Amino acid sequence: MNILVLNCGSSSVKFRLIHTYFDLIRENKDYSIASGLIERVGSEGLLSFRSTNAQGEVLSTLRTTAPVRTHQAAIDQIIKWITSENSGIQGIQSLEDIHAVGHRVVHGGEKLTRSVLIDDSVVEQIEDCIELAPLHNPQNLKGIYAAKKTFGPNIPQVAVFDTAFHHTLPDHAYLYALPYQIYRRHRIRRYGFHGLSHRYVRFRYRTILGMERENVNIISLHLGNGCSACAIKNGNSIDTSMGMTPLEGLVMGTRAGDVDPAILTYLAHKEGHSLDDLDKLLNSQSGLLGISGLTNDMRELIEESLENDDRRAKLALEIFAYRIKKYVGAYLSAMNGADAIIFTGGIGENADFIRQKICAGMNWCGIEIDENLNKQTTRGREGRISPDGNKPEVWVIPTNEELVIARDTYRCVMRKE
């Protein structure tokens, strides 16, 4: 089965075309046929595509610009290239050769707690969650609307939710200490995000060690421009750092993470900030960017810190690592210990300097990393970076959210659910 995976943002569309079926899933041999990104949707789009064979060898690449005014136009560009001879993809000549479409949807609320075939009722429920994820769900829906128009009713579409992995959180972990009737009226609670990434890490870790899902006890750290920690006990998410929105928790590229909420009322009175001003402050002007005053790019901050001895760059890195360290310690307590700490995401997979900083001084609970293994495990490499015999182990596992979406899409289509 050839499955097109779509991840639609406000001004971008990411895609991956994955070939899979039951035996391939069972043996972990499903593979990517093509992948790419269209940036600057809404204007002159920048297209970056490539195709690969089952061995991962690149067959063809395309990097060009084209008018891409809408998400519909972006998906049309993707289909045009995939089905063209120039793509080098064997066996994909028309829409009929794409058997299903899987969509990443950020927020499923309390009702959409598993991946589902998309029908009118599911679309309505995703629309109902827009107020919970106003920056993300509308863009995800644009992809669904566009794919429905392109493929018609005969090609099944599946919604795979970032929040679904965290539906196992107990109520004492997901409820805020606000009047309970506020939760009843508005469903204000912790939902958690990065679920596809944390779920892949759980799958990959247990596959490497040959263990059953219910025996997995890990802390997963997804560190990128957005960051979250997840406590996974007996195979289930029991706590996670992001909350009702992706703003809560760890320090991120431009997001503040945990903040005393009284600061907002103070700023509103003191500086006359509106609600929109405060939202922009917390989501777009804070985090690594806000502290450093330079950038939200971790690579640049590390360079400024090490080569130019920039004080605020150093401070940003210290605050970033310290916040993560606090969450790891809290989750170790909540879980009564863990078997492994796992780094994933762009920063988690590549920034050995940050991994070292996070783990430094945690030998009191057994967390140590091997300096050589840590430096070697970057650029897509997977492996344990802690010394032999140490518990908890420390691992780096590159995430693969698209594979999770493709496999769920396959299962939903085959089970017709």
UniProtKB/Swiss-Prot annotation:
- Per UniProt, where does substrate bind? 104
Q: Which chemical reaction does it catalyze?
A: acetate + ATP = acetyl phosphate + ADP
Subcellular locations according to the entry = Cytoplasm
Q: Which GO terms describe its molecular function?
A: acetate kinase activity; ATP binding; magnesium ion binding
Q: Where does ATP bind?
A: 14, 222-226, 297-299, 346-350
Q: Which cofactor does it need?
A: Mg(2+); Mn(2+)
Pathway(s) where this gene product acts: Metabolic intermediate biosynthesis; acetyl-CoA biosynthesis; acetyl-CoA from acetate: step 1/2
Provide the GO biological process annotations: acetate metabolic process; acetyl-CoA biosynthetic process
- Kindly indicate whether the keyword Ion transport belongs to this entry: no
Q: Which residues form the active site?
A: 162
HAMAP family found in the cross-reference section: Acetate_kinase
Protein name (Swiss-Prot/TrEMBL): Acetate kinase
What organism is recorded for this protein? Chloroherpeton thalassium (strain ATCC 35110 / GB-78)
Lineage, highest ranks first: Bacteria, Pseudomonadati, Chlorobiota, Chlorobiia, Chlorobiales
